[in-house]
């Protein structure tokens, strides 16, 4: 019997690596399915989910209302929490009021990071930067936060 291949799309970030570890290392096996992994940044995954491109994909909470007609939320797999994320980084300590009007690096407009920041402090200038380059953007001054 031929195995049906399912593409598992997720980011290369450590939280997604942890969530998909069992499938990626074939520690979770199926006699019916073969899982192939596609690694992309979260904003790209959000956009591709809007087109229903993958059978199984990681997305942002913010993106889900836009793809709810194509995907179900699984009972496990989340990367939001106190002291974990989303979080802001800056060269020096800042208050919420200090964020007003600042250029803030975000990993995309459909991300949970952008949504929660917009609720916390709606008056900022979003600077879209791939997730893995946010620290560099703050360090080199492309973004204030």
Q: What residue spans do the PLM features occupy?
A:
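N-terminal hydrophobic or amphipathic helices and topogenic motifs
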Residues: 1-79
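Bilobed "Venus flytrap"/periplasmic-binding protein-like clamshell domains
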Residues: 3-25, 86-145
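Short, flexible loop segments at the rims of nucleotide/cofactor-binding pockets, characterized by
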Residues: 33-36, 83, 122-125
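Portal/gating segments that form or line small-molecule/metal binding sites
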Residues: 75-90
